[in-house]
Swiss-Prot record:
PANTHER family: RNA-FREE RIBONUCLEASE P, UPF0278 PROTEIN TK1425. Its EC number is 3.1.26.5. This is RNA-free ribonuclease P. It comes from the Bacteria. One of its GO terms (biological process) is tRNA 5'-leader removal. SUPFAM superfamilies: PIN domain-like (SSF88723). HAMAP family: RNA_free_RNase_P (MF_01078). It comes from Hydrogenobaculum sp. (strain Y04AAS1). Keywords: Endonuclease, Hydrolase, Nuclease, tRNA processing. The lineage of its organism: Bacteria, Pseudomonadati, Aquificota, Aquificia, Aquificales. Transmembrane segments: none annotated. It catalyses: Endonucleolytic cleavage of RNA, removing 5'-extranucleotides from tRNA precursor. Disulfide bonds: none annotated. Belongs to the HARP family.
Length: 186
């Protein structure tokens, strides 16, 4: 049976991951990944929203035709995919907890009488982002990766904690992206 593999931008933009493919820049890792796909029996998919996001982060102009010939750019059929109500319930509860945590962080920083406003704002942004976004689905691109994996009964190859956490909740197989080369060679 041939694996359908769904990828996201993290494998090309997270230095810890893309350096396992190529020691250079993200564009070099993408070119190396394209080479790996040609030797693999697996079908590689990327949701269109993720592709658009990748194009904003990395200039693909010089390799766009090879990328689109090697990786299937496909949106999930959002109209026909059914999501378990318990998953929605869990997501809303998780968001409520995160929002409350974010409010507590904001209150803590509002009470801080430090004179260095710029430093305080930077710390607030970092803690707030960590509280609200880390380990959960925090974008439509993340949701599309999950939905496409459900639709195609696929395997997710991502370094995003939120995607991997929610893939686990839905029973979707994930592969550690540090093992990209080995995974694609089987």
């Amino acid at each position: 049976m041939q694996d359908n593999v769904i990828i996201d931008t993290s494998i090309f933009t997270n230095p810890n991951i893309y350096k396992s493919i190529s020691l250079e820049q993200p564009i070099d890792a993408i070119e190396a990944f394209i080479g790996l796909t040609h030797k693999s029996s697996k079908k590689i998919y990327m949701p269109r929203t993720v592709y658009i996001e990748l194009c904003k982060v990395v200039d693909l102009e010089s390799i766009k035709s090879r990328f689109e010939s090697s990786i299937i750019i496909k949106s999930p059929n959002r109209c026909n995919i059914t999501i378990n109500a318990l998953a929605l319930f869990d997501f809303v509860e998780d968001m409520r907890i995160r929002i409350n945590k974010g409010l507590r962080i904001a209150e803590e920083f509002a009470r801080d009488k430090t004179q260095d406003i710029q430093n305080t704002i930077s710390k607030l942004r970092e803690k707030y982002k960590e509280a609200l976004r880390q380990g959960t689905l925090d974008s439509k691109e993340d949701v599309d990766v999950i939905l496409l994996a459900l639709e195609l009964n696929g395997v997710i190859l991502s370094g995003d904690e939120g995607i991997n956490s929610w893939a686990d909740k839905f029973g979707i197989r994930t592969v550690n992206p540090l093992f990209i080369q080995e995974f694609l060679s089987f």
